[in-house]
Amino acid sequence: MYHIDCRDQLERVFLRLGHAETDEQLQNIISKFLPPVLLKLSSTQEGVRKKVMELLVHLNKRIKSRPKIQLPVETLLVQYQDPAAVSFVTNFTIIYVKMGYPRLPVEKQCELAPTLLTAMEGKPQPQQDSLMHLLIPTLFHMKYPAESSKSASPFNLAEKPKTVQLLLDFMLDVLLMPYGYVLNESQSRQNSSSSSQGSSSNSGGGSGIPQPPPGMSFYAAKRVIGDNPWTPEQLEQCKLGIVKFIEAEQVPELEAVLHLVIASSDTRHSVATAADLELKSKQSLIDWNNPAIINKMYKVYLGDIPLKTKEGAVLKPELKRDPVSTRVKLKIVPHLLRSRQAAETFPANIQVVYDGLFGTNTNSKLRTLSLQFVHHICLTCPEIKIKPLGPMLLNGLTKLINEYKEDPKLLSMAYSAVGKLSSRMPHLFTKDIALVQQLFEALCKEEPETRLAIQEALSMMVGAYSTLEGAQRTLMEALVASYLIKPEVQVRQVAVKFASTVFPSDHIPSRYLLLLAAGDPREEVHGEAQRVLRCLPGRNKKESASKQMPSFPEMVYYIQEKASHRMKTPVKYMTGTTVLPFNPAAFGEIVLYLRMCLAHSAGVVPTSQSLADMQDHAPAIGRYIRALMSSSQATASSSNKSGETNPVQIYTGLLQQLLAGVGGLPVMYCLLEAVSVYPEKLATKFVDKTEWIKSLMSSSKEEMRELAALFYSVVVSTVSGIELKSMIEQLIKATKDNHSPEVQHGSLLALGFTVGRYLAKKRVRMAEQHDLETDADLLPEQEEIIRSATETIGSFLDSTSPLLAIAACTALGEIGRNGPLPIPSEGSGFTKLHLVESLLNRIPSSKETNKMKERAIQTLGYFPVGDGVFPHQKLLLQGLMDSVEAKQIELQFTIGEAITSAAIGTNSVAARDAWLVTEEEYIPPAGAKVNDVVPWVLDVILNKHIISPNPHVRQAACIWLLSLVRKLSTHREVKSHLKEIQSAFVSVLSENDELSQDVASKGLGLVYELGNEQDQQELVSTLVETLMTGKRVKHEVSGETVVFQGGGLGKTPDGQGLSTYKELCSLASDLSQPDLVYKFMNLANHHAMWNSRKGAAFGFNVIATRAGEQLAPFLPQLVPRLYRYQFDPNLGIRQAMTSIWNALVTDKSMVDKYLKEILQDLIKNLTSNMWRVRESSCLALNDLLRGRPLDDVIDKLPEMWETLFRVQDDIKESVRKAAELALKTLSKVCVKMCDPAKGAAGQRTIAVLLPCLLDKGMMSPVTEVRALSINTLVKISKSAGAMLKPHAPKLIPALLESLSVLEPQVLNYLSLRATEQEKDVMDSARLSAAKSSPMMETINMCLQYLDVSVLGELVPRLCELIRSGVGLGTKGGCASVIVSLTTQCPQDLTPYSGKLMSALLSGLTDRNSVIQKSCAFAMGHLVRTSRDSSTEKLLQKLNGWYMEKDEPVYKTSCALTIHAIGRYSPDVLKNHAKEVLPLAFLGMHEIADEEKSEKEECNMWTEVWQENVPGSFGGIRLYLQELITITQKALQSQSWKMKAQGAIAMASISKQTSSLVPPYLGMILSALMQGLAGRTWAGKEELLKAIACVVTACSTELEKSVPNQPTTNEILQAVLKECCKENLKYKIVAISCAADVLKATKEDRFQEFSDIVIPLIKKNSLESMGVRTTKAEDENEKERELQLESLLGAFESLGKAWPRNPDTQRCYRQELCKLMCERLRLSTWKVQLGVLQSMNAFFQGLMLLEEEHADPEALAEILLETCKSITYSLENKTYSSVRTEALSVVELLLKKLEEAKQWESLTAECRGLLIESLATMETDNRPELQEKASVLKKTLESLE
């Protein structure tokens, strides 16, 4: 039975379909019946299903041909989602959804888009694909909320992770789809059927499957194309829609990164740009190290690599994805370069590299990016993960280098990558020397731009080969050697790098290669080689333990072997007649290196920097050479060299060879040194080469001549007898050769050195008492020649050539040093006295050079050394001490040395042979005569010179005294005068110049060391007393006294010079160890003098080292003080203390060890009463805080902050700046410490810091302190994150207060003085600035972490701030915080919403409109989280305010609040619509004052009303009861304005509802009429207007008699009463209202009405024609306007009130007509217009013009009167509006006359007048008037 019914129903539907003729009918039937018809498919009856199918087939044909027909998609979607529906139904339903959805208007599609997503859940894959295919094009048109929040999101995807994934996958395929792609499936089907036997897979991805687009599988392409493929333009829109969808954050950012990357590579500009911009904006938010993002990128890049799945099944061919196109790859790789994770992901990383370098579709851009990726892997991939990659990367790079030669830049990158790989994985390269060779070869052959990269790569690879052994090392030697001789400079440079780094520093063959390179012509090659060769071995034991230089014999033999080999080959070097094995530069370097090896083997630190330093090591080298010479067998045994060729002899041979060929000072020195240290064996070899030596003595270089002369003297000293005599004679002769000054100079020196050596030997012989008799016969002759030689030398002292004079002086000094001068003591001629005086006179002479003076002083000092009975010793010493000159410091050190030597005489160390004995080893000969005058010298210095009034003398004396103490430390005289010497030094400590002070301090240190224990105690106490009390030596002032030295002016004369020593002394006293002051003085070595040759001779560095060791136990007390002193503003103290620090604190961890102590000291001294200490403490603190873990001193942080805040306000600027510096550093450190990674330490730091920064920092009166505190808080909030949560209740209110406190006060001042409008703009800008301030930024950071645990404490403080907070920023900020809280933690906030509401209420009535708006805005959000009861109370409060309070501020706050609720919490408003919307309705009728903001308020109320009602009419119907109640209340208000507002609202109700029904009509009218009673008040007009509106709208309802509803009569009575009021303005409205009521009710009250109106018209006419009153012009103007208005109103009202009553008309028609006609002739155009309109109404209702009331005579009279006056208007040329209105009156008359057939009443006179006037209008400038006039004229003419 049921299925018969079904079939009947289906038949009926069929029938209806058949009858549907229009599209509209068809659409209606489909909308109604399609869903139920589809449901019938679930029928079990075959017949029913069959019938349905027939119906659907018919339907499909009809629908497909009519694209405009809409389908009931919404209903179908609901049906599709029905879980109970059978699949048969859903399968058909989706067909119609697919057909209907694209036909919908775009807005409707957007509305249904979320439903499509919901419908997808749990459906089969093809249907899901179809739905997504429908959805994607819609995304382009979707509108998303500006602020993304889950509640406002159109797609609520958060709960649908599976749907999101499906959608994202589909979107990815859409983005990958190229434009214009066609899937040729028909061909593929044939293929698949033909090749179904073979299952081999081909490049197409499977048998017979067409090639999908790059990055897609066949299936993906097919589903994107779908049933209706998109055109390229549609596809572009789809892609843009997807990008918009992602932009709107509809899906998690993480999931959509890949989509944006792919979209950014799109071929269409619009898509690529949109995606690019979005990617850039999210760049900082995306975590590129997220494995999910990176794996997706790799998967898309590489496609599905054919790997078998775990089960062993291969991926279906149609599902296999191809790799993406090169264009997409070029976009993916730059993002991989950002990611550390990408570099670690194996094997994808290597697959991408190989694809980019060698893939089939790669290009140079992709290759470049792939190489960058290789660099990225080398830099960031961790050790464990790079291991398996290394060999593959290296293979790839070498393959690229070998095969790809087109792009030099690319090659450069490849080479560079090889270098980087070698530094990461050296073991890969160590065994592969061939690779080095390959790169060296490439360096020879490649383009110049590539060479730099190869050079860099090779330099990086060096480290990989430093462990080579055996054959590998030999191979590398050969390789380096072969490339060292290549023509390309870069090749040689790299070869040097290899030679120096790959081999150890004692590896002879590589050193030899470097020596050859040192002779390279290019600076970059030889410079590097020299740097390596001259790098000195370490001084400490640990370093020296490893053999760092080759042994001297081995190196010599190797060089000799190479030299002899080279002499036989073309590489030898020719210079003039000489042939050398090496070029001069290389040879020079070789001999210097051999000298370094010699020194190293001799056990001293090798140096090749200065000859003087080298000479200091000569005795040690001498011992080694002697040992080497004596054990020649041992050296020969290591190789098969003949025993005669001793290494030393080979060495001297090489030196001689180079010296003969090229020369050179260092070479000369090396030869001289070798011979001098062992003359017995080595000098004898050169006796036959004296001529060659002489040639060297006449060299053009002075130093060369000096060294050659020394060499000559050593050689000559080995001969004796006649040979010696002849050699000396030759020299004497040569000195007289005036043609060559060089020869003279060399001979003079040689003569001096030779005589000196002769005397020294003689002295030794005499001492040893050897056979004097045997030599006696030769002696007299020799003595004679010696004397002769001395006199010859003496004769040159007065030479005009300074060169020869200096040489003579030097020669005499050498003779005097070695023995008594062989000349008379006194008398005439060249005597010792003459010599002394001559030399002494030269010292102060201005003619002499400094060099001459130096030599003269040295020579004078030597005379008593060689001569134990030198007669003029004291004269000489006195002369030296008297020769003081200003600014001759170096000279004073020389004098000091000379005085020391001369004072001790023969016991002086100057008497030794410097080549054989060091100063320390020298012991004076036992038999020498003693000529020690030290007591006398000491006495003269202490009692005369040191207390001289001349500061230069004092300084010189101090230097001499230091020299005496240093050199004669063991002398009993010095030891017995320690106190006097100390006093002398102390007196100099207070000198104004630094050098004197420094010399004195060094002297004091030495004196202390020399005393015994008792001496030391006395010395300490004296020194401390002198320093601390500042007692000074009084200097007598004579006429010659120099008061200020040059540069002394401007220095404090109050002993400021002592400040450094006072500090040192107080430092020692604080340690209870006053004697430490000496140690400090020794360490405080800060004068440059001590670095000079003369200063270094004192050896203070050794003393300092010892002092450092002695001070070590006091480090705990010293370190804090010294640390601070290093930053002292006084340069002297700073340098001294830094010197002490560097000497004592050698271990860098010392500061960390004593961190607490240092910190304590610094904090204490930050507030010292001395500015110097405060400043140094700040600077020290700044330095201390940097880069140190401060976890142990967290408790000290507040103290540091607070103290530095105080110092920031210091009286001294430099201290303030130092404090600022320290604070900035402290801020940075604290921010780092507040990182969540620090755990508990971070939490502790925040806990101690916040109170300090909030209470002390932000509230500080110092601007800089406040700024820094805020800055620090902002940074802490960024880094601390969730750790801020417990502190939020304190932090947030404090920051909110600061928003106002920190605002410039001038803004408040300006705001108070501004106009209302300016104030609003300005305050808005202020609040906006506050909201974007760092404080607000910090607050917003904190808000993220708030929850119920914190709110309890925070809310009361927040409420307090809102109520009592001062300042715009604070109050606005509070409101902003509340808004944030409602979004961050809505549920947690609910219990506190009531409190916050009541607090915000106080803000709503704030005088400042900006605060008011902020609070309203906050309230709008807050109601969302509050309880209903709280919201109701709020709304009642607002209602009360609005109705009862007159102040505008309350009205405004109500409007703002309700508007905010409507906008931000619409659901809340809907729930309370009955309370809110009536108020809104009333509010929107507020009478707006243009000047005030009421217009804005009206708009807000209107918006609230319109947004929340279903159309205004519907809204009024819905809330009619409430609306009437509130308007009644308004009418009963005491406020006139509110009454008027209520009236307007009532009028609006009646207008919009068109007809009110009882009891509402009665209620409204009663209320209005009640309001009418009484006197006139401003706005009362509105009541009248409302009455008119109500009566007009509800006239039919008023006819019925209803209890409690005023009758028409009562209403008219009340209104007419109001028309009698005196107030003209009000009267006009009342008359208009009465007229409207009369017109609506059709009542006849014309008699009463005309009695009111006609006098008004007549009065007006009289006044307007009468004389003007004497009132002011503008008042007159206003009055005239009002009268005009009343006149117009009166005429209009008469027209409206003209009744349909024949009796009344009979009474008044004549009078009224006459009145109008009169006014028509006399009035202005405005009045004419009004009269004409009234006339129109008059004739419209004139019953005379109707047949049944005809009275031809009366009518004729009226018409004549009318025609006479209307001609004026018809002929009014100026105003077309007047002509138009007049024409319409004439037209009406003619029409009425025609209808009533009363033409006879229109007399000929009338017709004539009218025709005449109409004729003038035929030329009217307005065509429509012209035409109408013409028609009317013809009508009239036809009557005649």
Swiss-Prot record:
Compositionally biased, Low complexity: which spans? 187-202
Q: Where is this cross-link: Glycyl lysine isopeptide (Lys-Gly) (interchain with G-Cter in SUMO1)?
A: 1034
**Repeat region (HEAT), residues:** 28-65, 107-144, 162-206, 327-363, 388-427, 430-467, 470-508, 684-721, 722-760, 784-821, 830-869, 871-908, 932-970, 976-1013, 1014-1051, 1113-1150, 1153-1190, 1195-1232, 1244-1282, 1286-1324, 1349-1387, 1391-1428, 1518-1555, 1559-1596, 1606-1643, 1647-1684, 1780-1823
Q: Which Gene3D superfamilies match?
A: Leucine-rich Repeat Variant
Q: How is expression of this protein distributed across tissues?
A: Widely expressed (at protein level).
Q: In the record, what terms sit under GO molecular function?
A: molecular adaptor activity; proteasome binding
Extract the coiled-coil ranges from the record: none
Gene Ontology biological-process annotations? ERAD pathway; proteasome assembly
Primary location recorded for the protein, binned into one broad class:
endoplasmic reticulum
Q: Which Pfam families match?
A: ARM_ECM29 (PF23702), ARM_ECM29_C (PF23731), ECM29_N (PF13001), HEAT_ECM29 (PF24492)
- Residue numbers bearing the Phosphothreonine modification: 831
UniProt cross-references to SUPFAM superfamilies, sorted A to Z:
ARM repeat (SSF48371)
Residue ranges of the region described as Disordered? 187-212
Task: PTM Phosphoserine: list the residues.
Answer: 825
Oligomeric form and interacting partners: Non-stoichiometric component of the proteasome; associates with the 26S proteasome. Interacts (via N-terminus) with VPS11, VPS26A, VPS36, RAB11FIP4 and RABEP1. Interacts (via C-terminus) with DCTN1, DCTN2, KIF5B, MYH7, MYH10, MYO10 and ARF6.
Its biological purpose is as follows: Adapter/scaffolding protein that binds to the 26S proteasome, motor proteins and other compartment specific proteins. May couple the proteasome to different compartments including endosome, endoplasmic reticulum and centrosome. May play a role in ERAD and other enhanced proteolysis. Promotes proteasome dissociation under oxidative stress.
Write the protein's name.
Proteasome adapter and scaffold protein ECM29
Question: What high-level taxonomic lineage is stated for the organism?
Answer: Eukaryota, Metazoa, Chordata, Craniata, Vertebrata
